[in-house]
């Protein structure tokens, strides 16, 4: 499973924000500023392409009336304020994985940008800020790719790190001869971060209609108006796709997809994806599309010897969740531990409504925080939890988990499996 995760194409759904100073700097012209922002994202996408990551601009916001935070020359303070605004405002109205602020302010010292290390997919920390420090947009793009690199688990390069160029993307200082290349150290650090954190949000491919930037033929992502995209003509190896137009070649029905073979749709009924487990189903081609639609068993079907119920193709049970949090010997705690979820305190609750934690009702205690007993000699506490203020949802009982006979968790409540949940 780890290898499958590492090999999977990743997608960073980005929202780029420009502050009021940027709006003034570019002559109060939204068109000029938007064009600069699009150009920056195109370069960032080019840089991350080598890491098997596609950066898709799903939101662009220009603060043309006034700033929504107090942008100041202290980069630390500005990053903190921007990240809080992202969590409390932007995330609530726009689904995305990462937000970057492009500012016209001059940060103190030599700082050109700042971001949280390994923050991707975390509501509070998937953010960065970058100073528009140069007229040449590709130099600003490299600085933003550097900050996103931090979000994706990469630290600054040491002297021993190499990428085959004079300077690599994660170099600690800005170079007058920058490159679009990540060093061997960056690649190792990014891989180690993916293995450790396994961030899930970047696995989800954005819809072509989610992308707000103008389509770019040659960026390996099929956008509105395109039928295929195999990169630039010089590097395209796809015989089904015309790289110059991003249209299918004459006679081709498709260029990619699990139900596409040699530019033609596979026949109806051809298996395109085997069932992963008892809650999954083998997926079949329709003969009319290149897509392999994911099907799974109905929610509520018993699984794992009646210890759980199928939920969206998985079988979530508490023991597996304890093992994921505390290691292979972990077990679910006694029922008494789950009574802490009646308190409605910072960790013991069932759900959040408008950022307020709601205590569990007695019948719902198994749908709040998960309590585990890690079977190690050093552990005396029978009611262990995983709680981090950075990611409060981690360590909660997963949706669809069996909470009683014939019942499963849904939005912090223990509901009948036969009702839609």
Curated annotation (Swiss-Prot):
A GO CC term attached to the entry: extracellular region
Source organism of this protein record: Lachesis muta rhombeata (Bushmaster)
Binding sites annotated in the UniProt record for Zn(2+): 146, 150, 156
InterPro entries recorded: ADAM_Cys-rich, Disintegrin_CS, Disintegrin_dom, Disintegrin_dom_sf, MetalloPept_cat_dom_sf, Peptidase_M12B, Reprolysin_adamalysin
One Pfam match: ADAM_CR
An MF annotation (GO) of this entry: metal ion binding
SMART domains noted in UniProt: ACR (SM00608), DISIN (SM00050)
Broad class of where this protein is predominantly found: secreted
Domain Peptidase M12B: 10-206
Gene3D superfamilies per record: Collagenase (Catalytic Domain), Disintegrin domain
Keyword Disulfide bond: yes
Alphabetical list of SUPFAM superfamilies matching this protein: Blood coagulation inhibitor (disintegrin) (SSF57552), Metalloproteases ('zincins'), catalytic domain (SSF55486)
Cofactor note: Binds 1 zinc ion per subunit.
Record: glycosylation sites: 312
Catalytic residue list: 147
Residues annotated for Ca(2+) 2 binding in this entry: 280-281, 283, 294-295
Top-level taxon: Eukaryota
Function: Snake venom zinc metalloprotease that induces apoptosis in vascular endothelial cells (VEC), without degrading the extracellular matrix (it cannot cleave collagen) or inhibiting adhesion of VEC. Has also fibrinogenolytic and hemorrhagic activities.
GO biological process: apoptotic process; proteolysis
Enzyme class: hydrolase
Motif, D/ECD-tripeptide: chain positions: 278-280
Family: Belongs to the venom metalloproteinase (M12B) family. P-III subfamily. P-IIIc sub-subfamily.
Residues the record lists as binding Ca(2+) 1: 216, 219, 221, 223, 226, 229
Cofactors demanded by this protein: Zn(2+)
EC number(s) reported in the record: 3.4.24.-
Quaternary organization: Homodimer; disulfide-linked.
UniProt protein name: Zinc metalloproteinase-disintegrin-like lachestatin-1
């Amino acid at each position: 499973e780890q290898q499958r995760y590492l090999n999977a194409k990743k997608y960073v759904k980005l929202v780029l924000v420009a502050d009021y100073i940027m709006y003034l700097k570019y002559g109060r012209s939204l068109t000029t500023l938007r064009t600069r922002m699009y150009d920056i994202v195109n370069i960032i996408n080019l840089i991350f392409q080598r890491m098997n990551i596609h950066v898709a601009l799903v939101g662009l916001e220009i603060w043309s009336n006034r700033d929504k935070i107090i942008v100041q020359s202290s980069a630390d303070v500005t990053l903190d304020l921007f990240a809080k605004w992202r969590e409390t405002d932007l995330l609530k109205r726009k689904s995305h994985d990462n937000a970057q602020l492009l500012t016209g302010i001059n940060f103190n010292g030599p700082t050109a940008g700042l971001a949280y290390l390994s923050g991707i997919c975390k509501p509070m920390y998937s953010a960065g800020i970058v100073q528009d420090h140069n007229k040449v947009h590709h130099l600003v793009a490299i600085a933003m790719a550097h900050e996103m690199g931090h979000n994706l688990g990469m630290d600054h390069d040491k002297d021993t790190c190499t990428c085959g160029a004079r300077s690599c993307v994660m170099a600690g200082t800005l170079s007058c001869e920058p490159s679009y290349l990540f060093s061997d150290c960056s690649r190792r650090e990014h891989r180690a971060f993916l293995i450790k954190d396994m961030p899930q949000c970047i696995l989800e491919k954005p819809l072509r209609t989610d992308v707000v930037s103008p389509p770019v033929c040659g960026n390996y992502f099929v956008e509105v108006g395109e039928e295929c995209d195999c990169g630039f003509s010089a590097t395209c190896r796809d015989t089904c796709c015309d790289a110059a137009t991003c249209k299918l070649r004459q006679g081709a029905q498709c260029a990619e997809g699990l139900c596409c073979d040699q530019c033609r749709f596979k026949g109806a009924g051809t298996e395109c994806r085997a069932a992963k487990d008892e809650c999954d189903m083998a997926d079949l081609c329709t003969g009319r599309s290149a897509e392999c639609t994911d099907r799974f068993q109905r929610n509520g079907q018993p699984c794992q010897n009646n210890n759980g119920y199928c939920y969206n193709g998985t079988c979530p049970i508490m023991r597996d969740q304890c093992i994921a949090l505390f290691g292979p010997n972990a077990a679910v705690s006694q029922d008494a531990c789950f009574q802490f979820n009646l308190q409605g305190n910072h960790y013991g609750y069932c759900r959040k409504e408008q950022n307020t934690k709601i205590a569990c009702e007695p019948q719902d205690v198994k749908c709040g925080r998960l309590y585990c007993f890690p079977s190690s000699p050093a552990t005396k506490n029978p009611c262990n939890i995983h709680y981090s203020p950075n990611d409060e949802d981690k360590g909660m009982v997963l949706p669809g988990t069996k909470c009683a006979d014939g019942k499963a968790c849904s939005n912090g409540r223990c509901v009948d499996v036969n009702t839609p949940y």
